């Protein structure tokens, strides 16, 4: 049996995105054959000045384009020159979004070929500002909006989306956008950005991706903003909220089947954990803030141990922030320690401590703690300040996921450096303004000894004549390849063991050259190859009996690479 990429994981390749090659011809179908002006206005098919002489004759494009014919590569060069002329990141973001709406293949080729430069533009940190100003810059719908007005009609509204073969949905309710709080309906920039990365980095076909925003109101911060695009009412909670989410999840499964991946994105803590627990046994669901963040941080830690020495179980961890990201990371670390040592999970959790807004999480606070914090309450006297917790616990690893900027103060970092030769410090909060400390602060305050990673990128730092290239613990290392692995295997559920496999696969991609440059996370320049290796989570899906696409390919990495979407232009009949 030959495994080929003609259908990208078993879903019909509507636009010939995978089955055709540059030398093969396809028909640009919309409701009818697109030609002339309509072809230029269709982002799936538009090639701009790259239309050949024959295509211009065949599809009535003569006179609608200047006479020159240019290559795809020259278009990329031209667009990069244009984007680099903008000094303001939001202007670059808007230019990229305009390109995506005009020429989809050029957008993805541009992003793939220049991923390290453009990733901070199409996603964090720039996407945070884009969400804050989404009402001002909104031009054209890029996904589906479900508000309380659509309650009882979600199944019908889903049918309004033109693509019918959906593989991945990223959905948010806008309540906790990055570290920026409740942005309501304007959180749509997050699903749009995430799915752009699913396609560019993980090779999922753009036509198989659906961004969704659930609008149940907001905190009324936009009540006086005349350009706000969402409901102008207080956020719905309780039964009203649950019923809308139930209807949405049921409708998605009815429309697209059991194998569609639903990624929950930027839900508030109280909903994020509940939704994952509620639907995890009945749907293929994934929470990037809880599971994706955990997987990439665990990979970074596993790689960092090559520089520090020792196993995970020999280290002590202190977290600032006990929300969905912090507790998700902690649980995956505890699971990996349990897997490595055979020690029960309840015991490995005791190596991990947490500080929230009220101080160190200890057993004397148990009755007042939210359910997801209780596993991390250990025997210790109460401690209010982070620096005192550091001095008392003496962690070897300090991880920030608090969303509170500049909380890793000079005193905190210096305390870490007093009892650690190489303190591991991960300041993970996004965007950059909310990072617990900067790369420069971590290196200078630790006298160049820290092993540092952040959620958003920082420029290389020079300290005492040495250049330090800090790692970026960006979820984009994990979720695109993770999603690809689920799709190519036809997985019907996500299992924690898959997250451990993804972490191990990413850690294995860190080279000796990376270590010599002071980073324990591989560069984004190789991200599509990294994603193909992370897609080995498919093997775990087969092992656990959760895969439905049979038989299992012999070489999953090669199969994953063959299934990846290519932005190369196609020739039209």
From Swiss-Prot:
The record marks 289 as: Important for activity. SMART domains: malic (SM01274), Malic_M (SM00919). GO terms for biological process: malate metabolic process; pyruvate metabolic process. Pathway: Photosynthesis; C4 acid pathway. It holds the Pfam family Malic_M. The active site is at 123 (proton donor), 194 (proton acceptor). CDD domains: NAD_bind_1_malic_enz. PROSITE patterns: MALIC_ENZYMES. Divalent metal cations. Prefers magnesium or manganese. GO terms for molecular function: malate dehydrogenase (decarboxylating) (NADP+) activity; metal ion binding; NAD binding; oxaloacetate decarboxylase activity. Its cofactor is Mg(2+); Mn(2+). It is found in: Plastid, Chloroplast. Its EC number is 1.1.1.40. NAD(+) binds at residues 176, 289, 430. GO terms for cellular component: chloroplast. A divalent metal cation binds at residues 265-266, 289. It catalyses: (S)-malate + NADP(+) = pyruvate + CO2 + NADPH; oxaloacetate + H(+) = pyruvate + CO2. Coiled coil: none annotated. The keyword Transmembrane helix does not apply. The chloroplastic ME isoform decarboxylates malate shuttled from neighboring mesophyll cells. The CO(2) released is then refixed by ribulose-bisphosphate carboxylase. This pathway eliminates the photorespiratory loss of CO(2) that occurs in most plants. NCBIfam families: PRK13529.1 (NF010052). Homotetramer. Belongs to the malic enzymes family. This is NADP-dependent malic enzyme, chloroplastic. The lineage of its organism: Eukaryota, Viridiplantae, Streptophyta, Embryophyta, Tracheophyta.
């Amino acid at each position: 049996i030959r495994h080929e990429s003609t259908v990208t994981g078993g879903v019909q390749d509507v636009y010939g995105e995978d089955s055709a090659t540059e030398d093969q011809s396809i028909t640009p179908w919309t409701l009818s054959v697109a030609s002339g002006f309509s072809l230029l206005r269709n982002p799936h098919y538009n090639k701009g000045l790259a239309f050949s002489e024959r295509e211009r004759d065949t599809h009535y494009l003569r006179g609608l384009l200047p006479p020159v014919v240019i290559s795809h590569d020259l278009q990329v060069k031209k667009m990069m020159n244009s984007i680099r002329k903008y000094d303001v990141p939001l202007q670059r973001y808007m230019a990229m979004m305009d390109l995506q709406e005009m020429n989809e293949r050029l957008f993805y080729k541009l992003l793939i070929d220049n991923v390290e430069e453009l990733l901070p533009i199409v996603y964090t940190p720039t996407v945070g500002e884009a969400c804050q100003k989404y009402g001002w810059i909104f031009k054209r719908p890029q996904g589906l909006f479900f508000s309380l007005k659509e309650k009882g009609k979600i199944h019908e509204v889903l049918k309004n989306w033109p693509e019918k073969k959906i593989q991945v949905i990223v959905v948010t309710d806008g309540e906790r956008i990055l570290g920026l709080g409740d942005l309501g309906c304007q959180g749509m920039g997050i699903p749009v950005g995430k799915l752009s990365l699913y396609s560019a980095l993980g090779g999922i076909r753009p036509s198989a991706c659906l961004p969704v925003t659930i609008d149940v109101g907001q905190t009324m911060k936009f009540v006086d903003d005349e350009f706000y695009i969402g409901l102008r009412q207080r956020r719905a909670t309780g039964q009203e909220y649950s019923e809308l989410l139930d209807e949405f999840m049921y409708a998605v499964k009815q429309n697209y089947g059991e194998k569609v991946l639903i990624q929950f994105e930027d839900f508030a803590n109280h909903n994020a954990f509940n939704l994952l627990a509620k639907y995890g046994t009945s749907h293929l669901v994934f929470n990037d803030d809880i599971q994706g963040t955990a997987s990439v941080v665990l990979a970074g830690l596993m790689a960092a141990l090559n520089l520090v020495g020792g196993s995970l179980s020999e280290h002590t961890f202190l977290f600032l922030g006990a929300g969905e990201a912090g507790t998700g990371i902690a649980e995956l670390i505890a699971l990996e320690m349990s897997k490595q040592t055979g020690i029960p999970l309840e015991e490995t959790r005791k190596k991990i401590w947490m500080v929230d807004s009220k101080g160190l999480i200890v057993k004397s606070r148990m009755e007042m703690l939210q359910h997801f914090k209780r596993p991390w309450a250990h025997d210790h006297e109460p401690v209010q300040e982070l620096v005192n917790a550091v001095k008392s616990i003496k962690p070897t690893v300090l991880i920030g996921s608090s969303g509170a900027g500049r909380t890793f103060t000079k005193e905190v970092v210096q305390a870490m450096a007093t009892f650690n030769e190489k303190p591991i410090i991960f300041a993970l909060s996004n965007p950059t303004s909310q990072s617990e400390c900067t790369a420069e602060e971590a290196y200078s305050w630790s006298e160049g000894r820290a092993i540092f990673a952040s959620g958003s990128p920082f420029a290389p730092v020079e300290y005492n004549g040495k250049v330090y290239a800090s790692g970026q613990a960006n979820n984009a290392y994990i979720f695109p390849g993770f999603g690809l692995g689920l799709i190519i295997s036809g997985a019907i559920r996500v299992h924690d063991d898959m997250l451990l496999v993804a972490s191990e696969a990413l850690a294995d991609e860190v080279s000796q050259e990376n270590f010599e440059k002071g980073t324990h996370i591989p560069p984004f320049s190789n991200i599509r190859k990294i994603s193909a290796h992370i897609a080995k989570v498919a093997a775990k899906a087969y092992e656990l009996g959760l895969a439905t696409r049979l038989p299992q390919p012999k070489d999953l990495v090669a199969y994953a690479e063959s299934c990846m979407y290519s932005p190369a232009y196609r020739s039209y009949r």
